[in-house]
């Protein structure tokens, strides 16, 4: 009869579940850490750009809010990074956001927007050609411009040239489906807000209002789709 020595019972060490997961899936966990660090870098860069843009707008006498600009810049960068990863579309969305932010503040200040903003959006649209398709972009931009030029002619100056230039450039970037949806969404938000605001402030409905901020909201919303 062979007597085997009795080995002492040793309880396994208590390991933090997070550490255990990291050890078991170290490759995935490491990639996640790297991704988070990259997102933080993108958000930080966006925050710095937002700060510089805000200073530039202040020097030009624009209506602006530093806190809003910095928070919106950071949130937009994180949101786009979560949606598209660290792809070219994330950076396209970030720069589109800054262009629309600049256009919105300019519109709120004196109802004008420099032509270089819409031209910059058109240049940024080149990134969309492989995924959206140039035909869709061209149709969307043309339809948007035609509709809004007609509205401009019928409104007697109530619908500004900057409005249709910015929105048509955005529709061109997004393609006809998403672009026109963003335009309609932005216009709808703008009309509802203006009706409520004019009612509260007892403001004349015939007075003009800044439309580009609402168009920007609609366009950035559908950019995530």
What are these regions (language model features)?
Residues 1-225:
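A membrane-topology feature that recognizes alpha-helical transmembrane segments
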């Amino acid at each position: 009869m062979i007597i085997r020595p009795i080995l002492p019972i040793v309880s396994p060490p208590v390991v933090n579940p997070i550490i255990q997961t990291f050890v078991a899936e170290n490759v995935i966990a490491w990639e996640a850490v790297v991704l988070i660090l990259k997102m933080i870098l993108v958000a930080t860069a966006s925050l710095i750009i937002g700060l510089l843009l805000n200073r530039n707008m202040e020097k030009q006498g624009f209506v602006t809010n530093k806190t809003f600009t910095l928070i919106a810049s950071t949130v937009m960068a994180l949101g786009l990074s979560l949606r598209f990863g660290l792809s070219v579309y994330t950076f396209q969305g970030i720069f589109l956001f800054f262009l629309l932010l600049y256009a919105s503040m300019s519109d709120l200040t004196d109802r004008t927007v420099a032509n270089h903003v819409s031209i910059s959006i058109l240049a940024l649209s080149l990134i969309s050609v492989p995924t959206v398709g140039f035909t869709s972009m061209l149709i969307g931009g043309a339809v948007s411009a035609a509709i809004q030029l007609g509205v401009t002619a019928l409104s007697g100056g109530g619908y500004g040239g900057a409005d249709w230039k910015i929105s048509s450039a955005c529709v061109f970037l997004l393609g006809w489906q998403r672009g026109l949806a963003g335009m309609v969404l932005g216009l709808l938000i703008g009309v509802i807000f203006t009706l409520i605001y004019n009612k509260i402030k007892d403001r004349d409905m015939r007075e003009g209002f800044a439309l580009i901020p609402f168009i920007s909201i609609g366009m950035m919303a559908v950019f995530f789709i």
